[in-house]
Regions:
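Intrinsically disordered, low-complexity terminal tails and inter-domain linkers enriched
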Residues: 3-43, 70-78, 187-190
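N-terminal secretory signal peptides and thylakoid transit peptides that target proteins
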Residues: 36-56
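Divalent metal-binding segments
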Residues: 52, 69-73, 80-87, 91-360, ...
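C-terminal segment of classical bacterial N-terminal signal peptides
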Residues: 60-66
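Active-site neighborhood of phospho(di)ester-bond hydrolases with catalytic His/Asp-centered motifs
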Residues: 146-148, 467-468, 530-533
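Acidic (Asp/Glu)-rich catalytic clusters
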Residues: 329, 363-368, 481
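His/Asp/Glu-enriched, well-ordered alpha-helical/loop segment
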Residues: 423-434, 441-464, 474-478, 489-610, ...
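C-terminal functional module detector
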Residues: 582, 590, 604-614, 623-626, ...
């Protein structure tokens, strides 16, 4: 499915929508220039809503009623809008807007910016002979979703391999599925050297709960091929003995920096590799062709556009990913604004000068790629918290399942001192830091590092971030506001299920468990909340993500996860995933709210998410997505229908086998949602 819109009928030379230029006054302060500085090649179609009678007839479509002042000066004739969205419930995201009266219409200028907002009647003046007018039918128009932590190219690459869809299975059931994959990927013709790589393995999904993966289970498959299961969480890999042999992994293999080769009581590898140890095997897997990757990535970027995502921070980027973005942009198949976060490994984190030179080199090489804006650095501070991985760094030890402390406090991949020096070097050079911090010790390490950087650089607006925040010590809540650190959360995980209950509660105990994903506690402490999906760790379900932030259950949870204490309001949730994340990415002067002068990065939904029942938010469909005034998704186009159908299938596949555990009794269905990269 192509990610660009289907062919559109041009109205006239004047109907083409040009995205905002880098010199836009709307982005003149702290935000970076728009990546859409070149004129758009897309024109807007009439969609049968604009009467051929001209401006007067079109004005009638906007409805009558008492006039109200639009929030921009009048325009007419040649200055008419390219597009007017009318009869809408506009969520502007601008504080105090509602006190001035409801906003029901948005006019998009021919420069790709928002021309005006106001009532239907007030915006009649912006309708010209070739203006397109769209009836929102009372549904929401709002800023596009800003995804502050996502891996879209990883989603594309994963789509090229068979997927276990994070299923919970017995070893026998798993072998049956994998045997089918062997047949589907070449069968006898792939013997003995064709790799079977399977995505979305559930590291806590072997039944009965607590069953540990071992290469001997995979060795029972009827094949001599190397077999590798890639964890859906991005932190675990499970290999058969053939793959271990090819990689030369033995009892004598040491743990690499930032990773772990899991070994059994006999000292031999079990076949499970954690975090950076995965590279021992992954580097040997044959790569897909560039053409295959570009096509797959273009398709998943189209899915993101169909979900209403207009800006993404790709949270794991190196040369490989930047070359893919370059190819996508050159082909006109990059529909979103992309902020690439350059990933530094644990060794690089100890070398600020070398790392800064590395990041600057990549920026120089790729900064002309249209659609990219550089300025972000990514570092892993720890792993994941769930059993059996337990590599997230904790202040207190993990428990053994019977409530007794163990010797394990997880893995801290970078010290506070090293992270502080690294952050200071990059902040001083104008870059932002983005830390993977899942456990409470990793979160504190990030905050300690940012405190050091703030102290030595004197900067008060560095806008560094900590992502995931699965467990935060109460003593650290206020430090986010004090240090100006963004709390980037993936709140689709904040529901009761296998991952938050069976794989976690017995191993950290109820006192710590209460502080899982403490969103409202952070909000009360003054933290700036920002949102991210971590896709493809989960299937892309943007609106269920927002719904779960509000009710702490979502569409597939087994019950509420501390809703009374940690649920967010609807308003906070909408802002978190729009203007909040725009602030994190330093583009709040460009996008994130619906107000004149900002880029027209907008979504038109199929319901009013500001008023519908909370549970109904999960099923929200996106009728139209615009980026810089350019239509990148239309639900009623052939491409749009295909994308919507695929998203619906992914949402349906998201349901997981029944899991009846809960924190305080009850039951229901669990689902995969481990923290990822």
């Amino acid at each position: 499915m192509p990610s660009s819109p289907s062919p559109r009928s041009p109205l006239s030379a004047r109907s083409a929508v040009s995205p905002p230029s880098a010199a836009s006054s709307a982005s003149a302060s702290s935000s970076a220039p728009s990546p859409y500085a070149a004129p758009s090649a897309y024109a807007l179609s009439r969609r049968g809503l604009l009467a051929a009678a001209g401006a007067a007839g079109a004005a009638g479509l906007l409805g009558a009623g008492p006039a109200s002042a639009a929030s921009a000066p009048p325009a007419g004739g040649r200055n008419s809008a390219a597009l007017v969205l009318r009869n809408a419930a506009v969520f502007t995201g601008v504080t105090g807007t509602d006190r001035r009266g409801p906003v029901r219409a948005v006019a998009v200028g021919r420069d790709g910016k928002i021309l005006a907002t106001g009532t239907d009647a007030a915006l009649r003046r912006y309708v010209g002979r070739d203006t397109e007018v769209v009836d929102a039918r009372g549904n929401t128009v709002m800023s596009g979703i800003h995804d502050g932590h996502v891996h879209p190219l990883g989603a594309g690459e994963r789509s090229l391999s068979p997927s276990l869809e994070s299923a919970e299975t017995t070893p026998a059931e798993l072998l049956e599925i994998l045997t089918g994959f062997l047949a589907d990927t070449g069968g006898a013709g792939a013997e003995p050297d064709g790799w079977l790589v399977v995505e979305d393995w559930n590291p806590v999904g072997l039944l009965p709960t607590g069953t540990a993966p071992h290469h001997s289970m995979l060795d029972a498959l009827p094949t001599r091929r190397p077999v590798v299961l890639i964890g859906g969480d991005g932190h675990n890999l499970w290999a058969n003995q053939r793959a271990l042999d090819i990689a030369g992994i033995t009892a004598a293999t040491p743990d690499p920096v930032g990773g772990k080769v899991v070994k059994g009581a006999d000292g031999k590898p079990t076949g499970v590799l954690k975090d950076d140890a995965q590279g021992l095997v992954r580097r040997l897997i044959p790569e897909h062709t560039r053409a295959e990757l570009v096509a797959a990535c273009a398709e998943v970027l189209g899915l993101a556009a169909a979900s209403g995502v207009t800006t993404m921070m790709d949270a794991l980027v190196g040369r490989h990913e930047l070359e893919l973005y370059q190819a996508l942009s050159a082909a006109g198949r990059l529909p979103q604004r992309i902020v690439p976060a350059i990933r530094l490994d644990a060794d690089q984190a100890r070398d600020p000068a070398g790392s800064l030179a590395y990041a600057r080199g990549l920026r120089r090489e790729f900064e002309e790629v249209r659609g990219l804006r550089f300025g972000m650095i990514k570092v892993f501070l720890d792993g994941v918290i769930e059993y059996p991985a337990q590599t997230a760094a904790l202040l207190e030890p993990y428990l053994d399942g019977n409530g007794r402390p163990t010797a394990n406090r997880g893995e801290l991949y970078t010290s506070a001192a090293d992270y502080g020096r690294l952050s200071a070097a990059f902040n001083r050079a104008g870059w932002q830091m983005h830390a993977h911090g899942l456990g409470d010790r990793a979160v504190r390490t990030a905050l300690d590092g940012y405190a050091y950087a703030r102290r030595v650089t004197g900067q008060r607006d560095a806008r560094n971030a900590v992502a995931h925040l699965q467990l935060v010590d109460p003593a650290d809540l206020r430090r986010f506001a004090q240090l100006g650190v963004a709390a980037c959360m993936q709140l689709q995980w904040a529901a009761r299920d296998t991952w938050t209950v069976e794989a976690l509660l017995p191993y950290i105990g109820p006192e710590r468990h209460r502080w899982l994903y403490p969103a409202r506690s952070l909000e009360k402490a003054g933290a700036r909340l920002t949102g991210g999906s971590d896709w493809p760790v989960d299937s892309l379900q943007v609106w269920n993500q927002l719904r779960t932030a509000i009710d702490r259950q979502g569409s597939e949870g087994a019950g509420e996860l501390y809703r009374e204490k940690e649920a967010l309001s609807r308003d906070t949730t909408l802002r978190m995933h729009t203007s909040g994340t725009a602030w994190q990415l330093r583009q709040e002067q460009l996008t994130g709210t619906v107000e004149p002068g900002k880029a027209a990065d907008l979504v038109l939904l199929d319901r009013d998410v500001t008023r519908c029942p909370v549970a109904d938010i999960s099923g929200t469909g996106v009728r139209m997505t615009l980026v810089g005034g350019r239509v990148v998704h239309e639900a009623d186009s052939a491409a749009g229908r295909a994308a919507s159908a695929r998203l619906a299938r992914a949402a349906a596949a998201g349901a997981r086998p029944a899991s009846y555990a809960s924190v305080h009794g009850g039951g229901g269905k669990g689902r995969h949602h481990a923290c990822g990269h």
